[in-house]
Amino acid sequence: MKIEAVIFDWAGTTVDYGCFAPLEVFMEIFKNRGVMITAEEARRPMGLLKIDHVRALTEMPRIRGEWERVFGQLPTEADVQEMYEEFEEILFSILPRYATPISGVKEVVTYLRSQGIKIGSTTGYTREMMDIVAREAKAQGYEPDYLVTPDDVPAGRPYPWMCYQNAMQLNVYPMKHMVKVGDTISDMKEGRNAGMWTVGVILGSSELGLTEKEVESMDLVALQERMEVVRKRFIESGAHYVIETMKELPQVIEYIEKQEFIIS
């Protein structure tokens, strides 16, 4: 079986090591309202369309309780819309600083293309946000063949529509000839819902949530323990394979191409 296309996520997978661009902004918009949320809470819905991410945060029991304590009522859809507008304003100002390709990505993409494999992409960012990220990433040497944002389809992750749109534009079918690579739970669900081979990447991921310096300085045993937690989350969410870095992807694809069975 031949893999004909790989569909990459963006932040935390191919650019923005650790997926830090949106994290601080999510925390800030709640802090501005007197509601403190943790980095772990802020990361939990990562990969969703960003307004859905804000909405998911307001639906978390602890955050809802804290909001009610501060405001005397539960958060409303109007609150979600107001926070999202603030989120966008702040994020747009910092996005250009968070589009650096993660180590190994450009080399792997070059190799995949040499094997005749097309490169697509999906994201939780809007089209307007991706205009910034994609432009900056291209200037630094990374540009997929196609990009789909949640704006382009009826719904973002975990729905499979962005992957289907990639398949149509790249002219690849059936879906078992495509691989989805991402760094969040919603990426894994997106890939599986689309009927694709699905691969989670640990280092640089939002799920791991560490900077490169933190990874380099962390005690090896402690790092391995944290990586194992992420590995299990990916597998439980549907990943067929989990890799530590992008450099392992070609080997995984070679292994997949030797398989004769149809994924389910």
Swiss-Prot record:
* Note on cofactor: Binds 1 Mg(2+) ion per subunit.
| Function, as annotated | Involved in phosphonate degradation.
List residues binding Mg(2+): 9, 11, 183
Q: Does the keyword Hydrolase apply?
A: yes
Its top-level enzyme class, in one word, is hydrolase
Name of this chain's protein: Phosphonoacetaldehyde hydrolase
Organism this protein belongs to:
Bacillus cytotoxicus (strain DSM 22905 / CIP 110041 / 391-98 / NVH 391-98)
Example GO biological process term? DNA repair
The catalytic residues are 9, 50
Report keywords, A-Z: Hydrolase, Magnesium, Metal-binding, Schiff base
Give GO cellular component annotations, separated by semicolons.
cytosol
Tell me the cofactors it needs: Mg(2+)
Oligomeric and partner information: Homodimer.
| Pfam families per UniProt | HAD_2
Provide the reaction this enzyme catalyses: phosphonoacetaldehyde + H2O = acetaldehyde + phosphate + H(+)
Per the record, the domain of life is Bacteria
Family, similarity comment: Belongs to the HAD-like hydrolase superfamily. PhnX family.
Q: What PANTHER family does this protein map onto? A: PHOSPHOGLYCOLATE PHOSPHATASE, PHOSPHONOACETALDEHYDE HYDROLASE
Q: Which GO terms describe its molecular function?
A: magnesium ion binding; phosphoglycolate phosphatase activity; phosphonoacetaldehyde hydrolase activity
Instruction: Tell whether Hydrolase is among the UniProt keywords.
Output: yes
> Which gene is annotated as encoding this protein in its UniProt record?
phnX
Q: What is its EC number?
A: 3.11.1.1
